[in-house]
Amino acid sequence: MAGFQMNLKKDKINKPNSQSKPKISFAFGGSKTNIIPKKSIASSQKNETRKLNPNALLGSESESEGEDAVVAIDSFDKKKGGAIAGNKAVNTKVTEPLIIKPTTASRDWKEEIRKKQNSMYIPNQEHRQKVIAKDDNNLEFGLSVPEKSNSKESVVDAESNDTMSKEERIRSSLLKGEELDDKGLIIPIPSEDEIVEQDISSKPDEDSIEQYKEVPVDQFGAALLRGMGWKQNKGKNIESAGKPLLERRKKGVLLGIGAKAVEDELMADLLVKRGAKFDIPVVRRNKDLNATK
């Protein structure tokens, strides 16, 4: 900065008879203390870059994140992670793409309960069915033979069951196709209120306002598409998993959305090509009888 400077100087040798008069000198210009040579600035910047913590290039320095660090970037390579300082990448943190999975539509839980209840097996359900009584007074024609009682066989089975072990009884009952004894197990069927409570408890918590603010607005659409199965580096015309490619429907002339293509002859008549004529049959009609001939 420009300024004004005044210095007062005295003689070093004091003569006895002469009066000492101070010498006054004036100087115009900037102060010498504020002037810094250019070489010192360049050397100080080099020293700062040399004294830089090597861990700062990897983003793992112990200092606070708010302080700025001087990093000399030599090149830029997208495959290696962006900016490169020397042989190392400046930012080695790999950020995964944001994915937002859409929630399912509101389900009709009452209908689901009815389907589950109808599909459940209810024991001894055959006993609840209506029994059609047989009429014993019906007359039967032909020779009637009375059925023999199996009392002897039942006595033999009871005696054999007493001598058999539990494993043998179970094995014989399975071979004969008999049903095992009911142990009285009860499977509780949840009510509608309990199912609603289970459905509410299984759903995730609502997102807070802070979580909404963390999602960038410009990345919301791509994140929602990724949640629905979209892949960024995959084009439309690339065939995958043996699925056929989508073909565009050829839309004919004078056709709207959802209309089908017409035949070639009718299309030629609509376009009024050369030699195309509309044939209208002439019918003779009797006015009195209002009948055709």
UniProtKB/Swiss-Prot annotation:
Task: Give a GO cellular-component term.
Answer: spliceosomal complex
Which positions, given as ranges, span the membrane? Answer: none
Q: State the organism of origin.
A: Debaryomyces hansenii (strain ATCC 36239 / CBS 767 / BCRC 21394 / JCM 1990 / NBRC 0083 / IGC 2968)
Q: What is this protein called?
A: Pre-mRNA-splicing factor SPP2
> Quick one: where is this thing mainly located?
nucleus
Chain intervals for the UniProt region annotation (Disordered):
1-65, 142-168
User: Taxonomy-wise, where does this protein's organism fall, top ranks first?
Assistant: Eukaryota, Fungi, Dikarya, Ascomycota, Saccharomycotina
Q: Which PANTHER family match?
A: G PATCH AND KOW-CONTAINING (PTHR15818), G-PATCH DOMAIN AND KOW MOTIFS-CONTAINING PROTEIN (PTHR15818:SF2)
Q: Which family does it belong to?
A: Belongs to the SPP2 family.
